[in-house]
Swiss-Prot record:
Organism expressing this protein natively: Chlamydomonas sp. (strain WXM)
Any one of the GO CC terms: chloroplast
Entries under PROSITE patterns matching the protein: RIBOSOMAL_L16_1, RIBOSOMAL_L16_2
Name of the protein this chain belongs to: Large ribosomal subunit protein uL16c
Gene name as annotated: rpl16
Transmembrane segments: none
Family recorded in the similarity comment: Belongs to the universal ribosomal protein uL16 family.
Length: 136
């Protein structure tokens, strides 16, 4: 699963999911893409689940790009711990996704295969998504 090698701070603030994606909202590498329609946190496990579906579906013919990276640590306290005594330890990693952000890109397969693969990968995502094709 994806995670940063090192970060400047171990425990980041949660932040807000306001506004739309201003960067990473156009197709750059491939011909087909899966775009987020809602704001959310996508965990490294969910990104990996989507990647597995797409690589299995397209086999050797296609090329896949993952356009998001989980660089934010989410902390959790142990179950049954009393209030206080500081913030919990980092538990898992998430990618902060705003509406319009491209999640995956694909190339080297037909549109029908790409559409089916992206639809299955969309089931693994915790957010509504949209299938995009590159405008010539």
């Amino acid at each position: 699963m994806l995670s940063p090698k090192r970060t400047k701070f171990r425990k980041p603030h949660r932040g807000h999911l306001r506004g739309k994606a201003t960067r990473g909202n156009t197709i750059v590498f491939g011909d087909f893409a899966l775009q987020a329609q809602e704001p959310c946190w996508i965990t490294s496990r969910q990104i990996e689940a989507g990647r597995r579906v797409l690589t299995r579906y397209v086999r050797r013919g296609g090329k896949l790009w993952i356009r998001i990276f989980p660089d934010k640590a989410v902390t959790m306290r142990p179950a049954g711990t009393r209030m206080g005594s500081g913030k919990g330890a980092p538990d898992y990693w998430v990618a902060v996704v705003h509406p319009g952000k491209i999640l995956y890109e694909m190339q080297g397969v037909s549109e029908t295969i790409a559409r089916q693969a992206m639809r299955i990968a969309a089931y693994k995502m915790p957010v509504k998504t949209k299938f995009l094709t590159k405008q010539a």
